[in-house]
Amino acid sequence: MTNILDILACPLCSGKLSCDGGSLKCALGHTFDISKSGYVNLLPPGKGKNSHTGDERDMVKARADFLSRGYYNRLDTRTAEIISDMPQDEMTLVDMGAGEGWHTLKTTSELISRSKKMLSVGFDASKYASECGMKKSRVAGLSEKNPYDMTSRASLVFIPANIFSLPIVNDCADVCLSMFAPIPWDEAYRVLKKSHDSMLLVLSSGKNHLIELRSLIYDSVNISDSLPEVPDGNDSFVSAGTTELCYTAHLENSEDIKNLFTMTPFYYKTTEEGKKRLYSQNELDVTVDVNYTIFKLK
């Protein structure tokens, strides 16, 4: 099984990283400390300062609290179903924008239960999110105290990094996963193994996703079903089709409603009046509408 050090690369020089006590080092001496929770911050100065910043503590906590309630578990089951159809018995999964790690963890656990041997790496610009993910991974038995030791058999690691400049080697991933995040097309192509079996799986919001919540916070709701498309000029990927998952989730209390709202992009664009209408709800049925689009290498 692939070890995490087999695929990691120095974010400053792209050299191979090795474990030296409580740090990772490359041949040029660039050093990255391993935190107590087990993550290594591979987000280099300057490269993390872009328009796609990482989640802060309040959003990370809201996501962790909401997702632990199980409302979105069906998303991860469907994700695992799609990936499990791939022929590889052993695979490396790269989650590009993993957040606090819930979806990566649930998907990885599901794939292992389907007899896949997994190495999953969740990248996110937020060190808070990666810390949360590493703690969950350890509790679930998918990681170890030092997952970067060459004897480690960790199945799931979370690392703060810029998803548009991933600190991993070329041609190392069987699956790249992008869930409700900006899609780094060039990086996905670079890190995917150049095989017809490799896959970029993109999850995006369907036209009715959270329509009930949006109707409460906005005076008028824009309903659109915008599927991800390969950018003009990109000749690396071709769409292999889209499937939809749509169901109703019953949010049982006001805390769950607020946590869901806090973890959405609507949180920063809603008026105080809109928030007041939403926060007055003690329970709420919401539509979960998600598109799964598979992209294959040309």
Where are these regions (language model features)?
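Conserved class I S-adenosyl-L-methionine
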Residues: M199-E229
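Conserved Class I S-adenosyl-L-methionine
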Residues: L5, L245-K298
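A short glycine-rich, Lys/Arg-flanked "PGG" loop and its adjoining helix->strand segment in the class I
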Residues: W185-M199
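A short acidic, Gly/Pro-enriched loop at the edge of an enzyme's catalytic core
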Residues: F164-V175
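Class I SAM-dependent methyltransferase SAM/SAH-binding core
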Residues: T92-D95, E100-S165
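Class I SAM-dependent methyltransferase Rossmann-like catalytic core
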Residues: K49, G54-R78
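N-terminal auxiliary segments of SAM/dcSAM-dependent transferases
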Residues: M1-H52
